[in-house]
């Protein structure tokens, strides 16, 4: 299990990372915009606080696969091996994930609202899957059940590793990164899933 801080506020990151054993930081365009600073400066400052051995997730903002691919390559060249780009599980996002994963780029599939999206993102080669728990609940789905289904799906996918190892330049070990929590109960239930 890994714990991530979901913020770009440097003071909060300093305080929390000083106390808790975190794996890294997650952000999104809205969180970054609240800081009213340059994106690259924020990400570099986050790495300076938590260390380059920790993980930072930040989202691509392109609307087409081609733009996302260019963006991901630039971001990974800028921030290094522990930088993961969050790509939404839209058709264009899946296309970008598929193309980037085969070249070894580290991708987090985000905006997941169904088990089918987890299957597509995992098959495309995303390493982290970020199902939106509360947002799923708000549209009549059960966010925790999606996490439970995700674990089952990913365990089945791991059994077909040989084909995936040939397809991708890294070990296929997808992970669940729960997102869009609104209360502690949701976090607790996701951990138990």
Located regions from the model:
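Active-site-proximal loop->helix
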Residues: 119-127, 141-152
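Alpha-helix-loop-beta-strand connector modules within alpha/beta enzyme cores
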Residues: 40, 44-55, 94-105, 143-176
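Catalytic beta/alpha-barrel core
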Residues: 4-6, 34, 57-64, 81-90, ...
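Catalytic cores of alpha/beta
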Residues: 11-19, 67-71, 96, 114-124, ...
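Active-site beta->alpha loop and helix N-cap motifs at the rims of alpha/beta catalytic domains
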Residues: 2-14, 19-22, 27-99
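Glycine-enriched alpha-helix->loop->beta-strand junction motifs that scaffold or abut catalytic
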Residues: 19-24, 79-81, 99-108, 123-130, ...
């Amino acid at each position: 299990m890994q714990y991530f801080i979901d913020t770009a506020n440097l003071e909060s990151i300093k305080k929390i990372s000083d106390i808790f054993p975190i794996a890294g930081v997650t952000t999104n365009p809205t969180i970054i915009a609240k800081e009213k600073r340059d994106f690259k400066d924020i990400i570099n400052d986050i790495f300076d606080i938590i260390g380059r051995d920790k993980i930072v997730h930040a989202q691509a903002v392109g609307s087409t696969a081609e733009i996302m691919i260019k963006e991901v390559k630039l971001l990974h060249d800028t921030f290094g091996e522990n930088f993961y780009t969050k790509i939404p599980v839209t058709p264009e996002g899946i296309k970008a994930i598929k193309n980037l994963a085969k070249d070894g780029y580290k991708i987090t599939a985000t905006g997941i609202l169904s088990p089918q999206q987890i299957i597509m993102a995992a098959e495309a080669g995303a390493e982290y899957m970020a199902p939106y728990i509360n947002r799923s609940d708000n549209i009549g789905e059960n966010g925790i059940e999606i996490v439970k289904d995700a674990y089952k799906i990913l365990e089945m996918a791991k059994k077909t590793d040989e084909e995936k190892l040939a397809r991708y330049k890294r070990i296929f070990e997808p992970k669940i990164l729960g997102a869009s929590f609104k209360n502690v109960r949701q976090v607790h239930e996701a951990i138990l899933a």
